[in-house]
A protein has these predicted regions:
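Short, surface-exposed terminal/edge motifs of secreted or surface/virion proteins that either
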Residues: 36-57
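Intrinsic-disorder-associated, low-complexity terminal segments enriched in Asp/Asn/His/Tyr and depleted
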Residues: 515-518
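C-terminal, surface-exposed recognition/capping segments
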Residues: 64, 247, 269-302, 344-353, ...
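Short hydrophobic/aromatic-rich beta-strand motifs
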Residues: 29-41, 336-338
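Acidic glycine-/aspartate-rich tracts in secreted/extracellular proteins
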Residues: 41-45, 140-142, 178, 351-352, ...
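Short, intrinsically disordered N-terminal pre-domain segments
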Residues: 1-30, 480-482, 486, 495, ...
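Extended, Lys/Arg-enriched charged tracts that mediate electrostatic binding to polyanionic substrates
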Residues: 95-158
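Short aromatic-cysteine micro-motif
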Residues: 128-130, 157-339
């Protein structure tokens, strides 16, 4: 060892011996907002962080994904916020299938077997024990923002600091991806049954017993308003595919899987960070000669149940009249939700496109609970304008959860990968959105597909509308982090308790460096 090296070693030894344990340090007298701590960042390097911000971040976790819009890839460039929260987000939100009563009380089904409850007792999906629904079991906040060329989508259980957020109460929609009609009582359901009372399609009994049977299928061929009317007969909080639910599926898929392309191939393994990757496969989007079935449903409501609350795809074989195979239909499943895209179009309620001479303006209803007159835009909220030309979607707006395209110019393998269809040049007036495409639309028919050509009295054999419910009440609106008096009391109580825990935790550590995650591990 050289003399210079020896001098430096002695200096380090002297500094080490002069160091103090945290419990031996003088009590700080400055403002918490001015204090800083050393943290170990995700890149493994030591960084500095404001103490007050660190406490807030630990208490109000947020997670999301971001896309670099300087390139056209549909895959996220990275994750935002808490990696651990992102890993656990499906569990945290309670994503999966439940049996739901008309008063909206719900009981969780076994995540691997939907014919029994979580406690192991038998469950029936025929409506006798409740409606078979896919739910997010707790409310959450959503925000989107842009920094430079980076576009962020994030969720949290509390308002995201400094961002405009939309609060989404707990709710759910039909686990089947479509609604089933109780033909006896004229009420929209979500059940799995081959009984004539729940015959699908247009209720054509002449198809019973044939290869084109509509027994056990979702209902189609009804007017836009009727789906809603029959759903609302269940009571407060029920409707048919309210636009919020459509947005929830899109948002959560993008954030959890890190892709805007739901039709990307299924990848069973998680990535190196323990996050979901890939997509849900092609779905039921490329059936040949569908006209032989009259464009009615071909995949029964029982298909896909075997995956439980899983993600991926399963296969249902569509047979010809002679019993031979016609088409191996792929059924995509998103944490138990069947057909988030493909098979049969979904009509979206609560959202109107006003197609005028010069522009097409999109409006949303401010509340599911209030009266909604779809013959007028009076009382509705303008959220965006959509393109006046059809094409693949390059940009979308999620302002107030409208989930509508604002720019085209992509392809089937870039940006959002899905198509926007409109006909403003030849037709004007109020229009509704069809989403998810059908069994004919191939690669352009993913969850983000938007079809804006249908009037309010539109009826089609290939259009469905899933039953939906929402818990809580209140209007759609942006929220910033404003504390009520009660919220201030709760926040003050949390700060006192958390800071007390922090002090006790720090006093136990006889080290000069503190890992950020270790430091806050005991905060709760």
């Amino acid at each position: 060892m050289t003399s210079d090296q020896e001098t430096r070693v002695l200096a380090m030894l002297s500094a080490f011996e002069a160091g103090k344990k945290i419990s031996e340090l003088d009590t700080a007298s400055g403002s918490v907002s001015d204090m800083r701590i050393e943290v170990l960042d995700t890149d493994g390097e030591s960084k500095v962080m404001n103490l007050s911000e660190a406490v807030t971040t630990a208490a109000n976790a947020v997670c999301g994904r971001y896309w670099n819009e300087s390139n056209s890839t549909y895959r996220a460039a990275g994750y935002h916020g808490s990696l651990d929260m992102l890993r656990k987000l499906p569990e945290l939100l309670g994503l999966g299938c439940y049996l739901v009563q008309d008063d909206r009380t719900r009981r969780k089904l076994d995540p691997t077997n939907h014919y029994r409850f979580e406690d192991g007792t038998p469950a029936k999906l025929d409506g006798t024990m409740g409606q078979y629904m896919w739910c997010w079991n707790i409310g959450f906040y959503f925000a989107e923002w842009k920094v430079g060329n980076l576009k962020y989508y994030a969720v949290s259980l509390s308002p995201i600091k400094g961002k405009q957020c939309v609060y989404i109460p707990a709710g759910g929609l039909s686990a089947l991806g479509g609604g089933v009609m109780d033909r006896t009582n004229n009420i929209l359901c979500s059940v799995v049954s081959d009984a004539a009372q729940y015959r699908g399609g247009n209720n054509d009994a002449s198809r019973d017993g044939t290869y084109r049977t509509q027994l056990g299928m979702v209902a189609t061929n009804m007017q836009y308003r009727n789906f809603s009317t029959y759903a609302r007969k269940r009571g407060e909080g029920w409707d048919a595919n309210w636009y919020v639910a459509q947005a929830v599926v899109e948002i959560l898929f993008m954030i959890i899987f890190g892709t805007r392309n739901m039709q990307e191939a299924v990848i069973a393994e998680k990535d190196s960070n323990g996050l979901y990757q890939g997509g849900l496969g092609s779905g039921t989007t490329n059936m040949p000669n569908w006209d032989q079935w009259g464009y009615y449903p071909v995949v029964p409501t029982s298909a896909g149940i075997e995956l439980g609350d899983g993600c991926g795809e399963t296969t249902f074989n569509v047979l010809k009249e002679d019993g031979s195979l016609h088409y191996a239909a792929k059924v995509p499943v998103f944490f138990g939700l069947k057909h988030p895209f493909g098979h049969i179009w979904k009509i979206v309620r609560g959202l109107i496109d006003n197609v005028g001479d010069e522009k097409s303006e999109v409006y949303v209803a401010p509340s599911l609970y209030a009266g909604y007159d779809d013959n007028s835009i009076s009382g509705l909220i303008k959220v965006c304008e959509v393109p006046r030309t059809s094409g693949y979607i390059k940009q979308k707006s999620y302002y107030l959860l409208c989930a509508m395209p604002t720019e085209i110019g992509a392809t089937a393998s870039t940006y959002f990968c899905d198509y926007f269809w409109e006909n403003s040049a030849s037709s004007k007036g109020l229009r509704v959105r069809l989403s998810g495409a059908s069994a004919l639309w191939h690669v352009c028919g993913g969850v983000c597909y938007a079809y804006e050509q249908c009037g309010l009295v539109f009826v089609c054999v290939c259009v469905r509308s899933p039953l939906l419910f929402r818990c809580g009440s209140g209007d759609v609106g942006l929220k910033r982090k404003r504390k009520t008096e009660r919220g201030k009391e709760r926040s003050l109580k949390f700060c006192i308790e958390s800071f007390g825990k922090a002090v006790r935790r720090v006093s136990e550590l006889a080290v000069r460096r503190v890992d950020f995650c270790d430091f806050f591990a005991g905060f709760g």
